[in-house]
Design a protein with these regions (language model features):
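Conserved mid-domain beta->alpha element of the FAD-binding
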Residues: 1-8, 124-125, 200, 257-342
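Active-site-adjacent segment of FAD-dependent monooxygenases/related oxidoreductases
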Residues: 8-87, 93, 97, 346-347
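Catalytic P-loop NTPase motifs of RecA-like helicase/translocase cores
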Residues: 11-12, 132-133, 289-291
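Short, flexible helix/strand-to-coil boundary loops that buttress conserved ligand/catalytic motifs
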Residues: 15-16, 32-33, 136-137, 294, ...
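C-terminal helical "tail/cap" subdomain of flavin- and related membrane-associated enzymes
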Residues: 37-40, 55-56, 246, 250-254, ...
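Conserved FAD-binding catalytic core of PHBH/FMO-like flavoproteins
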Residues: 68, 79-243
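Flexible internal linker/loop segments at domain or repeat junctions
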Residues: 214-277, 281-283
């Protein structure tokens, strides 16, 4: 019997925005019957890079990089996957307070916040960047704050002109950071009707000593790593808007100004030496944590889950399956690590002077972010 213990008492469908990943990731989910063939999605064929250029509404175009990505609504994705959970399997508002293995590790006993003790053959931790499972499987792992927050929001086609964003993920670049803006299908249960929704998000520096203030919500509650949509204080949104008004083109600023509710996510990173121990394993951000700008979050989470299924199905024992799977995940992480570092360097920490880039410099910069990709520059 499968049981899912979700520590949040609220429905997680409201805790996300858009999901973007290579098109083959979603095709693979359809092939595994995790998503229906007609699941709402939008196609992205280019990554478009722009910068502020005076009063030009959409800024100056720096170049396009050919892509094959798909975007979906987080709310719809959650509802579809949640729908497939067996009846009675999902339990909201329950935390894991402790674990204990028997001598031969044939099962794990889990203690919940309700005082119950339950035994399982396998426990999969998917509990995010502050994972209890990581503390057990990889004790001493350093969770590092990167000095950035990701401020994001959603705005529907009924609220703003977003059709001009069609087919692209627009990266708005400025000194010390960048933003990403792209279309997703409007959630089926969206409060504001519209065929599509624009998701925007910007990386902004926030010193560690002021992070706790930024993460304190409208009710005075301090959050650990994120402030949910609709709970970001007005003084924080005003400060962020004023900062971006000097950095991004007017059109993209107007999307922010018309967005009713926003959320904040603090950016962390962590690396784990192993993904499994005994009958315990880590998936998603419970394992290695990459910043979202690496583009690996969805790819990593889905890859963790599907490969875990395949490894366990192919192995003679759970232990053998977990051992093979853990090694596979480590190899994948080693391949993704330089990608995350390269993107962070070129889009956060060492962004060149965009006002004086020659065509050759632009090509070199975009090639460093997207090695081997087809790049189109202005005038080409």
């Amino acid at each position: 019997m499968v049981k899912v213990f979700e520590r949040s008492a609220t429905v997680l469908a409201s805790q996300g925005a858009g999901v973007i990943a290579p098109a083959e990731v979603f095709r693979g989910m359809v092939a595994r019957n995790l998503l229906p063939e007609d699941h709402p999605r939008c196609s992205v064929t280019v990554a478009r890079y722009v910068r502020r250029d005076g009063d030009r509404a959409e800024g100056r175009w720096l170049g396009d990089v050919d892509f094959n990505l798909t975007t979906v609504s987080w709310a719809d994705l959650f509802h579809e996957l949640r729908r497939q959970a067996p009846p009675g399997a999902y339990h909201n508002g329950i935390e894991v307070h402790g674990l204990a293995s028997d001598n031969d590790a044939a099962f794990v006993t889990m203690k919940t916040s309700e005082g119950a003790h339950e035994q399982f053959d396998l426990i999969v931790f998917a509990d995010g960047y502050r994972s209890l499972g990581r503390q057990i499987v990889a004790p001493g792992t350093n969770l590092r704050y990167r000095g950035l927050v990701f401020w994001r929001g959603l705005i529907s086609s009924a609220e703003a002109d977003i059709d001009r964003l069609d087919g692209a993920v627009t990266r708005v670049v400025y000194p010390g950071g960048h933003g990403a803006v792209y279309l997703i299908p409007a959630a089926r249960e969206a409060a504001v009707p519209g065929n599509r929704t624009a998701m925007w998000g910007y990386y902004l520096p926030v010193p560690a000593d002021t992070l706790s203030s930024v993460l304190t919500d409208t009710h005075g509650r301090q959050h650990h790593g994120s402030v949910p949509s609709g709970q970001v204080r007005t003084d924080v949104t005003e400060a962020f808007s004023e900062r971006l008004a000097e950095l991004i083109p007017p059109y993209f600023l107007s999307l922010i100004e018309r967005t009713a509710h926003t959320s904040i996510q603090a950016i962390y990173s962590a690396e784990v030496p192993a993904y499994a121990q005994g009958r315990l394993c880590l998936t998603g951000d419970a394992g290695t944590v990459f910043p979202p700008f690496s583009g690996s979050g969805v790819l990593k989470a889905i890859g963790n889950a599907t490969s875990l299924h395949d490894s366990l199905a192919a192995a003679a024992t759970i232990g053998q399956g977990l051992s093979a799977w853990s090694k596979q995940q480590q190899a994948t992480i080693e391949a993704l690590q330089p990608v995350a570092e390269r993107i962070g360097k070129n889009l956060i920490s060492e962004i060149p002077d965009l006002t004086s880039l020659s065509a050759a410099d632009s090509y070199s910069w975009l090639s460093a972010i997207h090695p081997g990709a087809h790049i189109t520059l202005p005038g080409k």
